[in-house]
Amino acid sequence: MPVLLTTQFRVGLLDARIKDERIPSLYGMLGQETNGAGGMFKAFRTIPVIGQIIEDMRELCPDAWLINFTNPSGMVTEAVIKHFGWKKCIGLCNVPTIAMMAEPKLLGKDISQLNYRYAGINHFHWHKVFDENGNDMTPILIDHINEKGGGTPANIYQAEFPLELLHSMNMVPCGYHRYYYMKQAMLEHAIEEFNEGGTRAEQMKQVEHELFEIYKNAELHEKPEQLGKRGGAYYSDAACECIRAIYANKKIHMVVSTQNNGAISCLDDDSIVEVSSIISATGAQPMAFGKLPSAEKGWLQMMKAMEECTIEAALTGDYGKALEAFVLNPLVENNENTTKVLDELLVAHAKYLPQFKEKIEELKAKGVHSTDPVVMDLMEHGH
Protein backbone atom coordinates (compact mmCIF):
# COMPACT_ATOMS: atom_id res chain seq x y z
CA MET A 1 0.00 0.00 0.00
CA PRO A 2 1.68 3.27 -1.10
CA VAL A 3 2.35 6.07 1.36
CA LEU A 4 1.64 9.54 -0.04
CA LEU A 5 2.52 12.93 1.44
CA THR A 6 1.39 16.32 0.21
CA THR A 7 3.16 19.63 0.80
CA GLN A 8 1.66 23.10 0.56
CA PHE A 9 3.34 25.73 2.71
CA ARG A 10 4.43 29.35 2.57
CA VAL A 11 7.66 30.24 4.38
CA GLY A 12 7.12 33.61 6.06
CA LEU A 13 3.38 33.49 5.39
CA LEU A 14 1.66 36.32 3.53
CA ASP A 15 3.84 38.95 5.18
CA ALA A 16 6.78 37.54 3.21
CA ARG A 17 4.74 37.68 0.02
CA ILE A 18 3.91 41.32 0.74
CA LYS A 19 7.63 42.09 0.76
CA ASP A 20 8.10 40.07 -2.44
CA GLU A 21 5.51 42.21 -4.17
CA ARG A 22 6.05 45.66 -2.68
CA ILE A 23 9.84 45.98 -2.99
CA PRO A 24 10.01 45.31 -6.76
CA SER A 25 6.91 47.48 -7.32
CA LEU A 26 8.66 50.40 -5.64
CA TYR A 27 11.26 50.24 -8.43
CA GLY A 28 8.78 49.86 -11.28
CA MET A 29 9.10 46.08 -11.57
CA LEU A 30 6.43 43.43 -11.38
CA GLY A 31 6.06 42.01 -7.91
CA GLN A 32 4.28 38.67 -8.19
CA GLU A 33 3.96 35.56 -6.05
CA THR A 34 5.71 33.06 -8.33
CA ASN A 35 7.14 35.20 -11.14
CA GLY A 36 9.84 37.84 -11.33
CA ALA A 37 11.91 38.86 -8.33
CA GLY A 38 9.23 37.87 -5.83
CA GLY A 39 8.91 34.38 -7.24
CA MET A 40 12.65 33.85 -7.06
CA PHE A 41 12.73 34.92 -3.42
CA LYS A 42 9.89 32.56 -2.65
CA ALA A 43 12.15 29.83 -4.06
CA PHE A 44 15.11 31.06 -1.97
CA ARG A 45 13.02 30.72 1.20
CA THR A 46 11.26 27.49 0.29
CA ILE A 47 13.87 25.17 -1.22
CA PRO A 48 15.98 24.79 1.97
CA VAL A 49 12.81 23.94 3.91
CA ILE A 50 11.66 21.29 1.44
CA GLY A 51 15.17 19.83 1.82
CA GLN A 52 14.56 19.49 5.56
CA ILE A 53 11.26 17.74 4.85
CA ILE A 54 13.04 15.30 2.54
CA GLU A 55 15.51 14.49 5.33
CA ASP A 56 12.59 13.70 7.63
CA MET A 57 11.05 11.51 4.93
CA ARG A 58 14.29 9.52 4.55
CA GLU A 59 14.00 8.62 8.23
CA LEU A 60 10.24 8.23 8.65
CA CYS A 61 8.83 7.13 5.28
CA PRO A 62 11.65 6.27 2.85
CA ASP A 63 9.31 4.77 0.23
CA ALA A 64 6.69 7.52 0.21
CA TRP A 65 5.46 9.55 -2.73
CA LEU A 66 5.66 13.32 -2.34
CA ILE A 67 2.90 15.28 -4.07
CA ASN A 68 4.06 18.89 -4.06
CA PHE A 69 1.79 21.94 -4.33
CA THR A 70 4.21 24.37 -2.71
CA ASN A 71 5.05 27.27 -5.02
CA PRO A 72 7.05 27.88 -7.06
CA SER A 73 5.99 24.31 -7.78
CA GLY A 74 8.31 23.55 -10.69
CA MET A 75 11.45 24.80 -8.97
CA VAL A 76 10.58 23.10 -5.69
CA THR A 77 9.93 19.83 -7.53
CA GLU A 78 13.21 20.16 -9.43
CA ALA A 79 15.12 20.72 -6.19
CA VAL A 80 13.47 17.65 -4.63
CA ILE A 81 14.20 15.32 -7.55
CA LYS A 82 17.53 16.57 -8.92
CA HIS A 83 19.29 18.03 -5.89
CA PHE A 84 17.83 16.18 -2.90
CA GLY A 85 17.57 12.92 -4.82
CA TRP A 86 13.96 12.08 -3.96
CA LYS A 87 12.74 10.57 -7.24
CA LYS A 88 9.22 9.72 -6.08
CA CYS A 89 7.93 13.27 -6.40
CA ILE A 90 5.27 14.87 -8.60
CA GLY A 91 4.58 18.60 -8.76
CA LEU A 92 1.00 19.82 -9.16
CA CYS A 93 -0.54 23.11 -10.22
CA ASN A 94 -4.16 24.10 -10.70
CA VAL A 95 -3.56 26.27 -13.81
CA PRO A 96 -3.92 23.41 -16.35
CA THR A 97 -6.92 22.08 -14.42
CA ILE A 98 -8.67 25.47 -14.57
CA ALA A 99 -8.03 25.68 -18.32
CA MET A 100 -9.30 22.16 -18.97
CA MET A 101 -12.44 22.87 -16.92
CA ALA A 102 -13.27 26.01 -18.92
CA GLU A 103 -12.11 25.39 -22.48
CA PRO A 104 -14.35 22.45 -23.50
CA LYS A 105 -17.40 24.69 -22.97
CA LEU A 106 -15.94 27.21 -25.42
CA LEU A 107 -15.66 24.43 -27.99
CA GLY A 108 -19.11 23.00 -27.27
CA LYS A 109 -17.58 19.70 -26.23
CA ASP A 110 -17.03 17.53 -23.18
CA ILE A 111 -13.51 17.10 -21.82
CA SER A 112 -13.74 13.38 -22.70
CA GLN A 113 -13.95 14.36 -26.38
CA LEU A 114 -10.70 16.32 -26.32
CA ASN A 115 -7.04 15.41 -26.30
CA TYR A 116 -4.76 17.92 -24.55
CA ARG A 117 -1.00 18.20 -25.02
CA TYR A 118 0.90 20.48 -22.63
CA ALA A 119 4.56 21.48 -22.78
CA GLY A 120 6.66 23.92 -20.77
CA ILE A 121 7.49 24.56 -17.15
CA ASN A 122 5.32 25.53 -14.21
CA HIS A 123 3.51 28.83 -14.86
CA PHE A 124 5.20 29.01 -18.26
CA HIS A 125 3.64 26.39 -20.52
CA TRP A 126 1.62 26.19 -23.70
CA HIS A 127 -0.90 23.63 -24.90
CA LYS A 128 -2.62 22.31 -27.98
CA VAL A 129 -6.05 20.67 -28.16
CA PHE A 130 -7.41 18.07 -30.58
CA ASP A 131 -10.89 16.59 -30.91
CA GLU A 132 -11.76 12.89 -31.00
CA ASN A 133 -11.06 12.78 -34.75
CA GLY A 134 -7.62 14.37 -34.44
CA ASN A 135 -8.71 17.79 -35.67
CA ASP A 136 -6.66 20.67 -34.24
CA MET A 137 -9.02 22.79 -32.13
CA THR A 138 -6.25 25.15 -30.97
CA PRO A 139 -7.08 28.00 -33.42
CA ILE A 140 -10.70 28.05 -32.21
CA LEU A 141 -9.60 28.24 -28.58
CA ILE A 142 -7.21 31.07 -29.38
CA ASP A 143 -10.12 33.11 -30.76
CA HIS A 144 -11.89 32.72 -27.38
CA ILE A 145 -8.89 33.21 -25.09
CA ASN A 146 -9.67 36.80 -24.11
CA GLU A 147 -13.27 36.05 -23.12
CA LYS A 148 -14.33 35.94 -19.50
CA GLY A 149 -14.37 32.33 -18.39
CA GLY A 150 -11.66 31.40 -20.86
CA GLY A 151 -9.58 29.54 -18.29
CA THR A 152 -7.51 32.32 -16.66
CA PRO A 153 -7.03 31.90 -12.87
CA ALA A 154 -8.77 34.48 -10.68
CA ASN A 155 -5.49 35.90 -9.41
CA ILE A 156 -4.27 37.03 -12.86
CA TYR A 157 -5.38 40.33 -14.39
CA GLN A 158 -6.88 39.49 -17.78
CA ALA A 159 -5.02 41.82 -20.12
CA GLU A 160 -5.87 40.86 -23.70
CA PHE A 161 -3.51 38.55 -25.54
CA PRO A 162 -2.59 39.65 -29.10
CA LEU A 163 -4.40 37.00 -31.16
CA GLU A 164 -2.06 37.34 -34.15
CA LEU A 165 0.85 36.28 -31.94
CA LEU A 166 -0.98 33.23 -30.63
CA HIS A 167 -2.20 32.17 -34.07
CA SER A 168 1.39 32.44 -35.30
CA MET A 169 2.61 29.94 -32.69
CA ASN A 170 -0.66 27.93 -32.85
CA MET A 171 -0.49 27.15 -29.17
CA VAL A 172 -2.55 28.34 -26.22
CA PRO A 173 -0.38 30.05 -23.57
CA CYS A 174 -1.18 29.79 -19.89
CA GLY A 175 -2.56 32.82 -18.07
CA TYR A 176 0.83 33.64 -16.57
CA HIS A 177 2.23 34.34 -20.04
CA ARG A 178 0.43 37.67 -19.81
CA TYR A 179 3.24 38.83 -17.54
CA TYR A 180 5.71 38.21 -20.38
CA TYR A 181 3.74 38.89 -23.57
CA MET A 182 1.98 42.01 -22.20
CA LYS A 183 4.50 43.05 -19.57
CA GLN A 184 3.74 46.77 -19.68
CA ALA A 185 -0.03 46.35 -19.36
CA MET A 186 0.40 43.94 -16.45
CA LEU A 187 2.94 46.23 -14.78
CA GLU A 188 0.65 49.25 -15.09
CA HIS A 189 -2.22 47.30 -13.53
CA ALA A 190 0.02 46.05 -10.71
CA ILE A 191 1.30 49.57 -9.98
CA GLU A 192 -2.29 50.86 -10.00
CA GLU A 193 -3.26 48.21 -7.44
CA PHE A 194 -0.12 49.01 -5.47
CA ASN A 195 -1.06 52.69 -5.27
CA GLU A 196 -4.79 52.26 -4.65
CA GLY A 197 -5.50 49.17 -2.60
CA GLY A 198 -2.23 47.48 -1.87
CA THR A 199 -0.62 44.51 -3.55
CA ARG A 200 -2.34 41.22 -4.28
CA ALA A 201 -0.68 39.81 -1.16
CA GLU A 202 -2.20 42.54 1.02
CA GLN A 203 -5.62 41.87 -0.49
CA MET A 204 -5.23 38.14 0.16
CA LYS A 205 -4.16 38.79 3.75
CA GLN A 206 -7.47 40.59 4.30
CA VAL A 207 -9.38 37.74 2.62
CA GLU A 208 -7.53 35.23 4.81
CA HIS A 209 -8.50 37.20 7.93
CA GLU A 210 -12.16 37.22 6.84
CA LEU A 211 -12.09 33.49 6.14
CA PHE A 212 -10.61 32.63 9.53
CA GLU A 213 -13.38 34.66 11.17
CA ILE A 214 -16.00 32.82 9.13
CA TYR A 215 -14.49 29.42 9.97
CA LYS A 216 -14.97 30.12 13.68
CA ASN A 217 -18.65 29.38 13.06
CA ALA A 218 -19.10 25.68 13.79
CA GLU A 219 -22.48 25.79 12.02
CA LEU A 220 -21.00 26.86 8.68
CA HIS A 221 -22.37 24.56 5.95
CA GLU A 222 -21.59 26.39 2.74
CA LYS A 223 -18.52 27.57 0.86
CA PRO A 224 -17.62 31.18 1.80
CA GLU A 225 -17.75 33.56 -1.16
CA GLN A 226 -14.31 34.90 -0.15
CA LEU A 227 -12.74 31.68 -1.45
CA GLY A 228 -13.66 32.78 -4.97
CA LYS A 229 -11.28 35.74 -4.63
CA ARG A 230 -8.28 33.45 -4.29
CA GLY A 231 -6.45 31.75 -7.15
CA GLY A 232 -6.40 28.20 -5.78
CA ALA A 233 -9.47 26.75 -7.52
CA TYR A 234 -9.48 22.98 -8.20
CA TYR A 235 -6.28 22.25 -6.26
CA SER A 236 -8.20 19.59 -4.34
CA ASP A 237 -9.42 18.02 -7.58
CA ALA A 238 -5.88 17.77 -8.94
CA ALA A 239 -4.58 16.38 -5.65
CA CYS A 240 -7.21 13.67 -5.29
CA GLU A 241 -6.93 12.68 -8.95
CA CYS A 242 -3.15 12.26 -8.69
CA ILE A 243 -3.31 10.37 -5.40
CA ARG A 244 -6.04 8.08 -6.76
CA ALA A 245 -4.00 7.33 -9.88
CA ILE A 246 -0.95 6.30 -7.84
CA TYR A 247 -2.86 4.45 -5.13
CA ALA A 248 -5.10 2.46 -7.49
CA ASN A 249 -2.80 2.35 -10.55
CA LYS A 250 -5.47 4.09 -12.64
CA LYS A 251 -3.26 5.39 -15.48
CA ILE A 252 -4.92 8.80 -15.56
CA HIS A 253 -3.90 11.59 -17.95
CA MET A 254 -2.84 14.70 -16.01
CA VAL A 255 -0.57 17.72 -16.44
CA VAL A 256 2.19 17.57 -13.82
CA SER A 257 5.75 18.65 -13.13
CA THR A 258 8.03 15.67 -13.63
CA GLN A 259 11.35 14.68 -15.17
CA ASN A 260 11.49 15.53 -18.88
CA ASN A 261 12.92 12.25 -20.20
CA GLY A 262 12.74 13.51 -23.77
CA ALA A 263 9.18 14.85 -23.69
CA ILE A 264 10.41 18.32 -24.74
CA SER A 265 13.30 17.86 -27.14
CA CYS A 266 15.03 21.20 -26.48
CA LEU A 267 15.51 20.59 -22.73
CA ASP A 268 17.77 18.17 -20.86
CA ASP A 269 16.30 14.80 -19.95
CA ASP A 270 16.72 15.48 -16.21
CA SER A 271 15.04 18.90 -16.35
CA ILE A 272 11.73 19.18 -14.53
CA VAL A 273 8.99 20.16 -16.96
CA GLU A 274 5.23 20.60 -16.77
CA VAL A 275 3.76 18.29 -19.39
CA SER A 276 0.88 15.98 -20.17
CA SER A 277 1.62 12.70 -18.40
CA ILE A 278 0.11 9.34 -17.55
CA ILE A 279 -0.05 8.85 -13.77
CA SER A 280 -0.01 5.32 -12.38
CA ALA A 281 1.46 3.35 -9.49
CA THR A 282 4.92 3.94 -10.95
CA GLY A 283 4.49 7.72 -10.98
CA ALA A 284 4.38 10.11 -13.94
CA GLN A 285 5.18 9.00 -17.48
CA PRO A 286 5.63 12.19 -19.55
CA MET A 287 4.07 12.20 -23.01
CA ALA A 288 6.22 13.39 -25.90
CA PHE A 289 5.43 16.86 -27.21
CA GLY A 290 8.36 17.11 -29.59
CA LYS A 291 9.79 20.31 -31.02
CA LEU A 292 8.56 23.73 -30.03
CA PRO A 293 8.48 26.60 -32.54
CA SER A 294 11.74 28.55 -32.60
CA ALA A 295 10.53 31.57 -30.58
CA GLU A 296 8.89 29.49 -27.86
CA LYS A 297 11.95 27.23 -27.73
CA GLY A 298 14.08 30.31 -27.01
CA TRP A 299 11.70 31.54 -24.31
CA LEU A 300 11.58 28.15 -22.62
CA GLN A 301 15.34 27.57 -22.61
CA MET A 302 15.93 31.02 -21.10
CA MET A 303 13.29 30.47 -18.41
CA LYS A 304 14.68 27.04 -17.55
CA ALA A 305 18.18 28.55 -17.24
CA MET A 306 16.75 31.18 -14.90
CA GLU A 307 15.11 28.47 -12.78
CA GLU A 308 18.35 26.49 -12.57
CA CYS A 309 20.29 29.57 -11.43
CA THR A 310 17.58 30.34 -8.87
CA ILE A 311 17.71 26.80 -7.45
CA GLU A 312 21.51 26.88 -7.24
CA ALA A 313 21.41 30.23 -5.42
CA ALA A 314 18.76 28.90 -3.02
CA LEU A 315 20.93 25.90 -2.18
CA THR A 316 24.29 27.66 -1.90
CA GLY A 317 23.57 31.26 -0.90
CA ASP A 318 25.73 32.37 -3.84
CA TYR A 319 25.00 36.08 -4.38
CA GLY A 320 26.49 36.08 -7.88
CA LYS A 321 24.25 33.19 -8.90
CA ALA A 322 21.21 35.02 -7.48
CA LEU A 323 22.15 38.10 -9.50
CA GLU A 324 22.59 35.93 -12.60
CA ALA A 325 19.06 34.59 -12.10
CA PHE A 326 17.79 38.17 -11.75
CA VAL A 327 19.48 39.20 -15.00
CA LEU A 328 17.97 36.22 -16.84
CA ASN A 329 14.43 36.87 -15.63
CA PRO A 330 12.44 38.95 -18.16
CA LEU A 331 10.34 40.48 -15.36
CA VAL A 332 13.39 41.96 -13.62
CA GLU A 333 14.54 45.16 -15.32
CA ASN A 334 18.28 45.17 -15.95
CA ASN A 335 19.22 48.68 -14.89
CA GLU A 336 20.67 50.55 -11.93
CA ASN A 337 17.83 49.20 -9.74
CA THR A 338 18.49 45.50 -10.33
CA THR A 339 20.93 45.06 -7.45
CA LYS A 340 18.90 47.45 -5.27
CA VAL A 341 15.87 45.15 -5.52
CA LEU A 342 17.99 42.05 -4.92
CA ASP A 343 19.77 43.60 -1.93
CA GLU A 344 16.64 45.02 -0.30
CA LEU A 345 14.82 41.71 -0.66
CA LEU A 346 17.76 39.87 0.91
CA VAL A 347 17.76 42.19 3.92
CA ALA A 348 13.96 42.14 4.21
CA HIS A 349 13.91 38.33 4.27
CA ALA A 350 17.05 37.80 6.38
CA LYS A 351 15.11 35.75 8.93
CA TYR A 352 14.36 33.05 6.35
CA LEU A 353 17.59 33.13 4.33
CA PRO A 354 20.37 31.66 6.51
CA GLN A 355 22.26 30.52 3.40
CA PHE A 356 22.82 34.21 2.50
CA LYS A 357 23.79 35.23 6.06
CA GLU A 358 27.26 36.59 5.28
CA LYS A 359 26.06 38.65 2.32
CA ILE A 360 23.10 40.00 4.28
CA GLU A 361 25.35 41.10 7.15
CA GLU A 362 27.57 42.86 4.61
CA LEU A 363 24.54 44.64 3.09
CA LYS A 364 23.23 45.67 6.50
CA ALA A 365 26.65 47.11 7.38
CA LYS A 366 26.38 49.25 4.25
CA GLY A 367 23.00 50.54 5.41
CA VAL A 368 20.89 48.67 2.87
CA HIS A 369 17.21 48.61 3.83
CA SER A 370 13.81 49.03 2.24
CA THR A 371 12.25 52.48 2.31
CA ASP A 372 8.77 51.11 1.67
CA PRO A 373 6.65 52.03 4.73
CA VAL A 374 4.68 48.77 4.77
CA VAL A 375 7.84 46.66 4.55
CA MET A 376 9.51 48.79 7.24
CA ASP A 377 6.50 48.29 9.53
CA LEU A 378 6.56 44.53 9.00
CA MET A 379 10.25 44.37 9.84
CA GLU A 380 9.84 46.53 12.93
CA HIS A 381 7.28 44.00 14.19
CA GLY A 382 9.58 41.06 13.52
CA HIS A 383 7.93 39.79 10.35
Q: Where do the protein language model's features map onto the residues?
A:
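Local beta-strand N-terminus motif with an aromatic residue
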Residues: 1-2, 63
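N-terminal Rossmann-like NAD(P) cofactor-binding module of classical short-chain dehydrogenase/reductase
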Residues: 2-9
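Receiver (REC) domain switch-region micro-motif
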Residues: 5, 66, 283
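Active-site beta-alpha loop architecture of Rossmann-like, nucleotide-cofactor-dependent enzymes
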Residues: 12
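Rossmann-fold NAD(P)-binding glycine/threonine-rich loop
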Residues: 15-83
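Soluble or luminal CAZymes and related metallo-dependent hydrolases
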Residues: 42-49, 95, 234, 302
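Rossmann-fold dinucleotide-binding core
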Residues: 65-133
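Long, compositionally biased stretches enriched for glycine and/or charged residues
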Residues: 105-383
